[in-house]
Amino acid sequence: MLSRKGIIPEEYVLTRLAEDPAKPRYRARQRRARFVSKKGNCNVAHKNIREQGRFLQDVFTTLVDLKWPHTLLIFTMSFLCSWLLFAMAWWLIAFAHGDLAPSEGTAEPCVTSIHSFSSAFLFSIEVQVTIGFGGRMVTEECPLAILILIVQNIVGLMINAIMLGCIFMKTAQAHRRAETLIFSKHAVIALRHGRLCFMLRVGDLRKSMIISATIHMQVVRKTTSPEGEVVPLHQVDIPMENGVGGNSIFLVAPLIIYHVIDANSPLYDLAPSDLHHHQDLEIIVILEGVVETTGITTQARTSYLADEILWGQRFVPIVAEEDGRYSVDYSKFGNTVKVPTPLCTARQLDEDHSLLEALTLASARGPLRKRSVPMAKAKPKFSISPDSLS
């Protein structure tokens, strides 16, 4: 009979002994699928596409969109296939002219020094890449050889233009610049100017600026129309305020972008309790602008789910003036602090102003209580005697 130690691993036994048998077990709640990931990738899988030929109508964009291993494979195979194809053409020309058979005559060959397929392949590489070793060359004996030489040069230039252009576009893609455009991990909802506001922080790590930068926000949620139609991804635009009006921003330093939750806001009926149970809420943030150094339009994206929105908190300041210039402490980029915030929806706050007045009064009493603390009288370190004044 086998012992228990031989059947169950020791690590498993120690783990089970450390567990509390009275503590109930909970399975991790499955998180809602994001429409846009935190890194900006769209979480959409395209299936059952019937018209695959549409991708071949725009070959260049298809090549640029491919992954790097596939692009490098196509890059290598395009050159190898063209070299082999024209090597076969040069070998057939030499075979038809009788240049492959050894002869003692003085007949001039179509291409000198071609005696096998290997030499024809080397000559094909020399022609297309213009290496020019000088051991093989086309003569005036065969007009067809001259025509093949012209065609191979044209085809080689086309392959170079397409493939090298594809490699350049992949290395200079706009989303590379978006890697240094950062968003705060969490968004916050707090009072600003007496109104509930949805706020997030955005920054740029590079010194080169984003010209004509604009920012947009959308709420994506699952809705049902009065007719019973279920819309799984209903998108609603969110108006924003950034202190300068409009959606344009001057991103020379990290900015706090905020949206006033008013009657026109899709977040007007959002309560603090909904942030823990509202699984269909996702706020997408899109930052778009022109890269100053390259002139390419770039776009950075992120999203916030309901559990990534902090109620009653505010971002800490990270910009300070030092030695006549402004410095940014990115170690506190996503840090927040708790602030007094009503635990109600923006609609309830607009309908009952006493909630805001009570909160304002409570906030005003806080500093007064600190001031009423009795302070010990400081004893003087020296005294002046009357004799010294005489």
From Swiss-Prot:
Subcellular location: Membrane
Alphabetically ordered keywords of this record: ATP-binding, Diabetes mellitus, Disease variant, Disulfide bond, Ion channel, Ion transport, Membrane, Metal-binding, Nucleotide-binding, Phosphoprotein, Potassium, Potassium transport, Transmembrane, Transmembrane helix, Transport, Voltage-gated channel
Annotated positions of the Phosphothreonine modification: T341
Catalytic activity as recorded in UniProt: K(+)(in) = K(+)(out)
Cytoplasmic side: 1-65, 172-390
Residue sites binding K(+) 2 per the record: F133
Site (Role in the control of polyamine-mediated channel gating and in the blocking by intracellular magnesium): N160
Effect of substituting R201H: In PNDM2; ability of ATP to block mutant channels greatly reduced
Intramembrane segments: 117-133
Effect of V64M: Displays gain of function; increased open state stability, reduced ATP sensitivity and increased channel activity; almost completely abolishes high affinity sensitivity to glibenclamide, an inhibitor of ATP-sensitive potassium channels
Modified residue annotations for Phosphoserine: S385
A GO cellular component entry from the record: T-tubule
Gene3D superfamilies, per database record: 1.10.287.70, G protein-activated inward rectifier potassium channel 1 (2.60.40.1400)
Quaternary state and interactors: Homotetramer; the homotetramer binds four ATP molecules (one ATP per subunit). Forms an heterooctamer with ABCC8/SUR1; one KCNJ11 homotetramer interacts with four ABCC8/SUR1 molecules. Interacts with ABCC9/SUR2.
Disease involvement: Hyperinsulinemic hypoglycemia, familial, 2: A form of hyperinsulinemic hypoglycemia, a clinically and genetically heterogeneous disorder characterized by inappropriate insulin secretion from the pancreatic beta-cells in the presence of low blood glucose levels. HHF2 is a common cause of persistent hypoglycemia in infancy. Unless early and aggressive intervention is undertaken, brain damage from recurrent episodes of hypoglycemia may occur. HHF2 inheritance can be autosomal dominant or autosomal recessive.
Protein family (similarity comment): Belongs to the inward rectifier-type potassium channel (TC 1.A.2.1) family. KCNJ11 subfamily.
Protein name, as recorded: ATP-sensitive inward rectifier potassium channel 11
Source species: Homo sapiens (Human)
Classification of source organism: Eukaryota, Metazoa, Chordata, Craniata, Vertebrata
